[in-house]
Curated annotation (Swiss-Prot):
FAD-dependent monooxygenase required for two non-consecutive steps during ubiquinone biosynthesis. Required for the C5-ring hydroxylation during ubiquinone biosynthesis by catalyzing the hydroxylation of 4-hydroxy-3-(all-trans-hexaprenyl)benzoic acid to 3,4-dihydroxy-5-(all-trans-hexaprenyl)benzoic acid. Also acts downstream of COQ4, for the C1-hydroxylation during ubiquinone biosynthesis by catalyzing the hydroxylation of 2-methoxy-6-(all-trans-hexaprenyl)phenol to 2-methoxy-6-(all-trans-hexaprenyl)benzene-1,4-diol. Keywords: FAD, Flavoprotein, Hydrolase, Membrane, Mitochondrion, Mitochondrion inner membrane, Monooxygenase, Oxidoreductase, Transit peptide, Ubiquinone biosynthesis. Its cofactor is FAD. Gene3D superfamilies: FAD/NAD(P)-binding domain (3.50.50.60). It comes from Saccharomyces cerevisiae (strain ATCC 204508 / S288c) (Baker's yeast). It is a peripheral membrane protein. Changing residue 248 to R: Abolishes catalytic activity. The gene is COQ6. It comes from the Eukaryota. InterPro entries: FAD-bd, FAD/NAD-bd_sf, Ubi_Hdrlase_CS, UbiH/COQ6, UbiH/COQ6_monooxygenase, UbQ_mOase_COQ6. Residues 1-17 form a transit peptide. Coiled coil: none annotated. The lineage of its organism: Eukaryota, Fungi, Dikarya, Ascomycota, Saccharomycotina. GO terms for biological process: ubiquinone biosynthetic process. This is Ubiquinone biosynthesis monooxygenase COQ6, mitochondrial.
Length: 479
């Protein structure tokens, strides 16, 4: 009897020790929450940096990154996906040189400028520079970065990607010490204790909530409608077209060969209509939006909503009205100069919409925490700067961490992180403010405002130094 009690007690003790061991947190130097472009770029850049490569790095994402990204990189589809962004040559250079990614260049299109028009007037702004920007699928960036990270040995190179896993809790390892290392609990039951926690986890960032860093901003009560398009022929000029309509800007941006991508900002009601239309009607409206007047477009919206115009009649009417506009041009070649190539079809299942908003965190860091990308800021897509801002955040954070390592500092301390925030916040704030003011300036057809912006746009188009400053900003070459 005594022997049985001893053995039972021993089993309980052994079980208790095993439980304590399994629940002990795993240590990591950097834990990145989010496997989007910003998070993957940061992980790859840390491993590619001579100063940072020995840091134990862990990336967590709720999506199945391995299957999704590996499949895309090894067997890409024969069509372009709808999540396509404009990136600067500087961002491409950083991805390939600092992060070590091998991008799929046959799925990237550089272009030589942007032709901007006001839908309420004849004002134009022709921004031209060779290889000013590139259009690239977000999944191309992610898959290329994931492929690079996969080439590292998990144990030897101290890099782990934990996908299909959510962050369920973040807290300080010592509740009474804000400088203590964060404890991150995952949905798979694992707990990590990290020297530096990086939030690359989007607009609703759990990392930002843990850091208690306030974020300010507003919803625009507008949506961006995206789609991948097939064109009648490749562009005569490799450039993007953007037209500011009273309901919001519409952008037609080139992809390889006779492909293009659409971003059409509109009201919630109009965005629902655009998604509900048959593909042929939607295609016809895109072509009309770059040529016809606002009154014509409003007429089409009304008749489509009340069902009084079918697809065939819509296509016929738009063709008639656009041909009338083309007939007023002095030269037939002006059609290709002023208007984008006609859209002939929409790639199946690429139409989607997303809400538009502006947000900006008060800070990008505190002790043990840094924020990058959408966790720190979101912007209207009209300036095409969202992803570039995130990539520049990562560049700034990597540089700050390298300097901290060179000086023997704790990479999770505010002393190490604040140079990153001090560098990135002012530039991002300017870009966010610029996009917000442009949206509000062009989101009206009030005659005095239209007259003022028409004068300003035409004047800007005539002043070379001002145009060059805009091109430098859009192209990521701002000083």
């Amino acid at each position: 009897m005594f022997f049985s009690k001893v053995m039972l007690t021993r089993r309980i003790l052994v079980r208790g020790l095993a439980t304590a061991k399994s629940s002990a947190p795993k240590l990591t130097d950097v834990l990145i929450v989010g496997g989007g472009p910003a998070g993957l770029t940061l992980a790859a850049s840390i491993k590619n940096s001579p100063q940072l490569k020995d840091l134990k790095t862990t990336l967590v994402d709720m999506v199945d990154l391995k299957d999704k990204l590996s499949d895309f990189y090894n067997s890409p589809p024969d069509y372009f996906t709808n999540r396509i962004v404009s990136v600067t040559p500087r961002s491409i250079h950083f991805l390939e040189n600092n992060a070590g990614a091998t991008l799929m260049h046959d799925r990237i299109q550089s272009y030589d400028g942007l032709y901007v028009t006001d839908g309420c007037s004849k004002a134009t702004l022709d921004l031209a520079r060779d290889s000013m920007l590139c259009m690239i699928e977000i999944i191309n960036i992610q898959a290329s970065l994931y492929n690079r990270i996969s080439q590292y040995d998990s144990k030897k190179d101290s890099i782990d990607i934990i996908d299909n896993t959510k962050v369920v809790n973040i807290k300080h390892s010592d509740p009474n010490d804000p400088l203590s290392w964060p404890l991150v609990t995952l949905s798979n039951g694992e707990v990590y204790k990290t020297r530096l926690l990086v939030g690359a986890d989007g607009f609703n960032s759990p990392t930002r909530r843990f850091s208690q860093i306030p974020s300010r901003g507003w919803m625009y009560n507008a949506y961006g409608v995206v789609a991948s398009m097939k064109l009648e022929y490749p562009p005569f000029k490799l450039r993007g077209w953007q037209r500011f309509l009273p309901t919001g800007p519409i952008a037609h941006l080139p992809m390889p060969e006779n492909n293009a991508t659409l971003v059409w900002s509109s009201s919630e009601r109009l965005s629902r209509l655009l998604l509900s239309l048959p593909p042929e009607s939607f295609t016809a409206l895109i072509n009309a939006a770059f040529v016809l007047e606002d009154a014509d477009m409003n007429y089409y919206y009304r008749t489509l909503e009340d069902g009084s115009m079918d697809t065939d009649k819509l296509i016929e009417d738009i063709k008639f009205r656009t041909e009338e506009i083309y007939a007023t041009l002095k030269d037939e070649s002006d059609i290709d100069e002023i208007y984008p190539p006609r859209v002939v079809s929409i790639i199946d299942k690429t139409r989607a919409r997303f809400p538009l908003k502006l947000t900006h965190a008060d800070r990008y860091c505190t002790d043990r925490v840094a924020l990058v990308g959408d966790a720190a800021h979101t912007t209207h897509p009209l300036a095409g700067q969202g992803l570039n801002m995130g990539q520049t955040d990562v560049h700034g954070l990597v540089y700050a961490l390298e300097k901290a390592m060179e000086r023997g500092l704790d990479i999770g301390s505010s002393l190490s992180l604040e140079p990153f925030w001090a560098e990135r916040y002012p530039s991002n704030n300017v870009l966010l403010g610029m996009a917000d003011k442009l949206f509000k300036l062009y989101h009206t057809n009030f005659p005095p405002v239209v007259a003022l912006r028409t004068f300003g746009l035409n004047l800007t188009n005539k002043i070379g130094p001002v145009k060059n400053m805009i091109i430098d900003t859009l192209g990521g070459n701002e000083k």
